[in-house]
């Protein structure tokens, strides 16, 4: 439990995290438009500011205790995706349809289906961690270094790349 639980400060931290996160996304979208319109310098400034906003959001999220181990993060991510597809998007689709916005309702439903896939992906990755399968397979597998591209064939990935010494 967060030391801020139940306080106005907790609400403020959550609002700050949400605001900075939304600003980051908006500035990234704005950068795309500026770049398409030929304003490279403005696009670069939007992206730099988006990076700043990302760090601000991370600060508040960490303060709320939102960042854990990879296994904890996968559990939290799966739970968030589950809430989105089982509740949030279903309810939003019902409301949109009741208000006559069928196209938006359909989009909410379609995105909900994607969120279900996200949950399943996170749970599979969590299972891989829990069963020590991230860097091992039951059969010969091609492992490619994500840094230099070295190809290794075997039942387990090397702990470090023999070419560039990048961790597995």
What would you call each of these model-derived segments?
Residues 1-168:
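Non-heme di-metal
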């Amino acid at each position: 439990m967060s030391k801020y639980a139940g306080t106005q400060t907790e609400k403020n931290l959550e609002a700050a995290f949400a605001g900075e996160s939304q600003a980051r996304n908006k500035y990234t979208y704005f950068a795309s438009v500026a770049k398409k319109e030929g304003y490279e310098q403005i696009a670069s400034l939007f992206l730099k500011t988006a990076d700043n906003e990302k760090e601000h959001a991370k600060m508040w999220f960490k303060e709320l205790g939102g960042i854990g181990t990879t296994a904890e993060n996968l559990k939290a991510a799966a739970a968030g995706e589950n809430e989105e597809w089982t509740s949030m998007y279903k309810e939003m689709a019902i409301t949109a349809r009741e208000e006559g916005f069928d196209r938006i309702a359909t989009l909410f439903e379609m995105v909900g289906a994607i969120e279900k896939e996200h949950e399943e992906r996170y749970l599979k990755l969590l299972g891989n961690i829990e069963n020590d399968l991230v860097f091992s397979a039951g059969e010969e597998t091609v492992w490619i270094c994500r840094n230099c591209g070295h190809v290794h064939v075997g039942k387990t990935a090397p702990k470090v790349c023999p070419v560039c010494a990048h961790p597995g």
